[in-house]
Amino acid sequence: MRIDQSIINEIKDKTDILDLVSEYVKLEKRGRNYIGLCPFHDEKTPSFTVSEDKQICHCFGCKKGGNVFQFTQEIKDISFVEAVKELGDRVNVAVDIEATQFNSNVQIASDDLQMIEMHELIQEFYYYALTKTVEGEQALTYLQERGFTDALIKERGIGFAPDSSHFCHDFLQKKGYDIELAYEAGLLSRNEENFSYYDRFRNRIMFPLKNAQGRIVGYSGRTYTGQEPKYLNSPETPIFQKRKLLYNLDKARKSIRKLDEIVLLEGFMDVIKSDTAGLKNVVATMGTQLSDEHITFIRKLTLNITLMFDGDFAGSEATLKTGQHLLQQGLNVFVIQLPSGMDPDEYIGKYGNDAFTAFVKNDKKSFAHYKVSILKDEIAHNDLSYERYLKELSHDISLMKSSILQQKALNDVAPFFNVSPEQLANEIQFNQAPANYYPDDEYGGYDEYGGYIEPEPIGMAQFDNLSRQEKAERAFLKHLMRDKDTFLNYYESVDKDNFTNQHFKYVFEVLHDFYAENDQYNISDAVQYVNSNELRETLISLEQYNLNDEPYENEIDDYVNVINEKGQETIESLNHKLREATRIGDVELQKYYLQQIVAKNKERM
């Protein structure tokens, strides 16, 4: 069934595309529009634009974009109906589930969506088992003793998997789900001898793991009785891939954008406690190193990343390794060094929330400053290490994109080598590494001097090298996009088959369909009438094409005449063929060509 158009319009009107896109892309204002790195493909310079006035977005690289619905479809790989429902939930507009082809029999087309639905349904039962059953009391007490309030447990969706081999299995089976699919989703395990299925998580506190869109895609089950392993995580599945997921990103995205900084912690428990303490831009990996996929996504939100790992040797080693890699990828890297032997949870437990947030705010160092402070003893007592680390730190500072931050780092690092900031700066110039010093730097965006490379002017490929007739077609369509009256006055004046540019021909047809249902042209509404990225790009490019506000006298008529020249050329060709048929005396051909000429002339009248 079709969704009522009034519902679609209400959702679209209540959803601001700038706010929506900003949750996924770090945008900078450029003139009247906003620009950022495209979320749909990897690129070195920004080519993804958002128009707040027109409520559309468009990538001039991969051609993807559109209005709020099409952006949501692309970013989440879902259908139009699902996008409408999701955005409706976002702005509190009810969408009739039955009328939009959703049903309660879990007959969802995508296996991935079924896997997500399984996780979200079982979460409700895990939560119930934790908070409402006798079996969950011990686990609940364990959490409460560690500072988890009832409100926090509910907010995070924390639950309890009973000590039963078929709690999850039986629940999903009763709901009509494919047990094999539940196994592939990581909720069940399988006995490889008899191929029987049983619950993967038993007698554990269950922490839901969500993707960037806030959908549950996995679990981390924590023991509260001392059993091993301490944490049992979901296995790699089609919906749960650790290299692509950052814990808490769905909640932290807005704060990351607002603060222009992301804080990376070691584990999700640290994230929960830090978030509760007031640090809202925190995320963590799922027990893995920061991957290239993680970095690519982070760069689209911010270029500033702060590392706050545990205050032990392993945490220090991880900070040095991760920070070095991030610096090489063009990010501004900072470090918060926790007291020895402490993690964020322990710091908060000992000193309180206010002390923790103050510590985070006031004890932040550049990566270069942190690195040299860790290596200071070796630098002071080993001349070979002195030379080695002098070159390393010089290069690290040279990678910093801000000249102000570079100068601050020079001032902080120079005393550790007993040199002046000026001498260290000279060392940087002397040992300046070539652009390909780090061959794995795939992100680009900066020249060999650390300067930001401005994006090249955006060109509209389909508007390059247009013929005289195509230019007339473009201007004609632009005027038709101005208002419905103009369209109605001139629609019958042109035969669509006379368009030489096929994209323009399709736009002409789209305008007909659009004005059949709308009285006023709006690009955000119009893009809903096209299905291909190429045609969508043409429509958006026409919208951005500048033409005089009001047509001069007979201007549109002139464009019509030029477009119809194609039809005139056809008549001239028919006249030529008629003369040739007359010359050779073929009466039948003469009659045929004469009929064609008469028909063509009638079309023009």
Curated annotation (Swiss-Prot):
Identify the taxonomic lineage of the organism of origin.
Answer: Bacteria, Bacillati, Bacillota, Bacilli, Bacillales
Which GO cellular component does the record give, naming just one? cytoplasm
- Fetch the HAMAP family from UniProt: DNA_primase_DnaG
- Which cofactors, by name? Zn(2+); Mg(2+)
* Protein known as: DNA primase
Main function: RNA polymerase that catalyzes the synthesis of short RNA molecules used as primers for DNA polymerase during DNA replication.
Q: Where are the zinc fingers (CHC2-type)?
A: 38-62
Occurrences of domain Toprim (ranges): 260-341
Which amino acid positions bind Mg(2+) 1, per UniProt?
E266, D310
GO molecular-function terms, A-Z: ATP binding; DNA binding; DNA helicase activity; DNA-directed RNA polymerase activity; zinc ion binding
Q: Does the keyword Cell cycle apply?
A: no
Catalytic class of the enzyme: transferase
InterPro entries associated with the record: DNA_heli_DnaB-like_N_sf (IPR036185), DNA_helicase_N/primase_C (IPR016136), DNA_primase_core_N_sf (IPR037068), DNA_primase_DnaG (IPR006295), DNA_primase_Znf_CHC2 (IPR036977), DnaG_bac (IPR030846), DnaG_cat_HB (IPR048453), DNAG_N (IPR013264)
User: What is the similarity comment for this entry?
Assistant: Belongs to the DnaG primase family.
Keyword Signal on entry: no
Q: What is known of its domains?
A: Contains an N-terminal zinc-binding domain, a central core domain that contains the primase activity, and a C-terminal DnaB-binding domain.
Q: Which residues bind Mg(2+) 2?
A: D310, D312
Cofactor notes: Binds 1 zinc ion per monomer.
| Keywords, comma-separated and alphabetical | DNA replication, DNA-binding, DNA-directed RNA polymerase, Magnesium, Metal-binding, Nucleotidyltransferase, Primosome, Transcription, Transferase, Zinc, Zinc-finger
